[in-house]
Amino acid sequence: FADLLRVNLSVLRRIIRTEHLVQDVAQADTEMKTEYAICYCKNRADSAMVIRVRRALAAAKPELLLDSSYFVPWLLPGKARLFTPVSYTERPAVAAAKICEGKIVVLVNGSPSAMVLPALFCENFECLDDYASTAVFSSFLRILKYVSFYLTVFLPGVFVCLAVYLPELIPPQLLYKIEAAEKATPLPLFAEMLLVILILEVIREAGLRMPQSLGHSVSLVSALIIGDAAIATGLMSTPVIFVASITAIAVFVTPSLYEPATLLRLGVVLAAGLAGPVGLAGAFFAVLLSLSGTACLQVPYLAAHPFPQRPIAEDGIIRRNYRRLSAHDFNIWQKREGK
């Protein structure tokens, strides 16, 4: 969405050529009177949810409205949450696909991204390109994304827990190398893991804030130099840097979950380092509780089915071919309310 609001709306209209597409344009209650639009298909979206969204946006009073994300505190009031049950996209084709699923899209004048609500946890592991690939390959990619997310959250904590509290579960040869490396470092294992994770986050943030022509090179060179110097001086061990590097790379497989995954990774390492297996189990249930307690527009974030009337085996972790998927309507509301 690279143009003004009216042009972006016309782009959506050209993709969704149906009289059921509704585009409600309104002005925000701000000094600049910024325009925004609520887009949905009236034969697919739930009318009660549309009314709720319209009222929430009309009651919102942000000081400035530069992006659709400014509406989130009014759409999702209440407690702080790690996972936000809304998603964003800059691709008109993705926004059109979400509208056809029965979702609601919010566009703001001058903003390149559109807000889609409600969002489901499983959708973080899906993308529009999945449907351009074969069913087998896209299913493989989805499995890879799920594995990468759980690796980036739990792998450092599991490593700390096994190395400190349950070393008998580690193969002897690997355990010998870990112990030999840890004897040369002055920090406890979990503190060392936290330090490596924080250093990698600093390097990543520095690379993002620098000019694009230098950012990637600086990040790569910094990681190599700091890692080599840390091992040479005995401040950090090779196994810890290896595990932290795997998690730092795996988090980019699901970029929409980067923020919660980073915070959860730190929390899991702390819990595993301080309380061992009990802390690790507690962290797992805390993550599960956070996910299960999140909802948007009365749609649970952990809804089992992207589209309730379609079996999860057809478009879940494993995807069937698009011809079979097209035999069902793309509507997330239909069976939830017994229609």
Each model region followed by its residue ranges:
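Cytosolic regulatory modules rich in charged/polar residues
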Residues: F1-E192, L297-H328, I332-K339
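Flexible domain-boundary/linker segments
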Residues: D29, Y70, W74, P112, ...
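Transmembrane alpha-helix detector for multi-pass membrane proteins
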Residues: S148-P167, E182-L263, V268-G273, L280
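Hydrophobic alpha-helical transmembrane segments of membrane transport and translocation systems
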Residues: T238-V240, A244-K339
